[in-house]
Structure formats: C-alpha cells, structure tokens
Amino acid sequence: MKVRASVKPICEKCRVIRRKGRVMVICENPKHKQRQG
C-alpha cells in the first residue's frame, strides 16, 4: 500500500474508488494499491 498526496491509476486494471472518505486505487497487481493521505 502506497500512501500518496495524489493517487493515479498505473495500469488499465487500476480502479479509483472512495472508501470512508478516502480515495483509493485497487488493482489486480498488489504493487499498485494506493491510498490518499
């Protein structure tokens, strides 16, 4: 899980979602997981 100021999709399978007011990226590739913080 990467914590970043700006989250962006890295590949075409990355999905930007909102959970509990946080912007997150979920993907098949675990290295692409990000959340805004």
Curated annotation (Swiss-Prot):
Q: Which GO terms describe its biological process?
A: translation
Which keywords has UniProt assigned to this entry?
Answer: Ribonucleoprotein, Ribosomal protein
Q: Where is the signal peptide?
A: none
Residues that span the membrane, as ranges = none
**Coiled-coil segments on the chain, per record:** none
* UniProt GO cellular component terms: cytoplasm; ribonucleoprotein complex; ribosome
Q: Which GO terms describe its molecular function?
A: structural constituent of ribosome
Asked if Hydrolase is a keyword of the record, the answer is no
The answer, when asked if Transcription regulation is one of the entry's keywords, is no
Which domain of life, per UniProt? Bacteria
The UniProt similarity line reads:
Belongs to the bacterial ribosomal protein bL36 family.
Q: Read off the PANTHER family from this record.
A: 50S RIBOSOMAL PROTEIN L36, CHLOROPLASTIC, LARGE RIBOSOMAL SUBUNIT PROTEIN BL36C
The protein depicted here goes by the name Large ribosomal subunit protein bL36
Q: What is the lineage of its organism?
A: Bacteria, Bacillati, Cyanobacteriota, Cyanophyceae, Gloeobacterales
